Amino acid sequence: QGKESECIDLYSRFDIRDISAKYRLFQGRLAFNERARCLMFAPSYASEIAFYAEQDDGSWMKKDSFCLGTGGFEDRISESSGFELLKDDIRNCMDACSSENYFYMLYDGTDLGHTRKIEFRYVIRFTANGVLDCVYKVNPTVRNICVSYDDSAVYVLMIGKDGEYAIGKSELSIR
């Protein structure tokens, strides 16, 4: 049975006492890179993707971050007392995974009101140390991703032409 080893408040700069509101606003996906002993936290709505390195004592230290967009979501939350998701908020991360060498994040880009139709979603690849490496365009119906250990292929769960779930595979070019 696991035990909590450390609690890190990723968004301590926001004075949100209601834990359910904080969860709604700052939920996301987590991926771990074994080789680098690094975690990537990619939030669903907030703009800052954070990378944490595991220390020798088992604690976690933030080592890098990458900002998607302008940070307008965080600015609005800082200035607001309502702490609600709005129809024009953008969903950033849908899914995240890692391979031996990289982290991958499935970027959505749709607003919560679904007022914009998207032509693509994007798989964003970061090095195991949190540096942006490349971006792949994918079908807008992709919902989940996983990548082969050697980064040669991406596997996806997507919505098929008749509305059914379908599994897809695409080869990735290795640089």
Show where each model-derived region lies.
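Surface-exposed loop and turn segments in beta-propeller and other repeat-based domains
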Residues: 3-25, 59-88, 140
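Beta-propeller blade signature
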Residues: 1-2, 118-131, 169-174
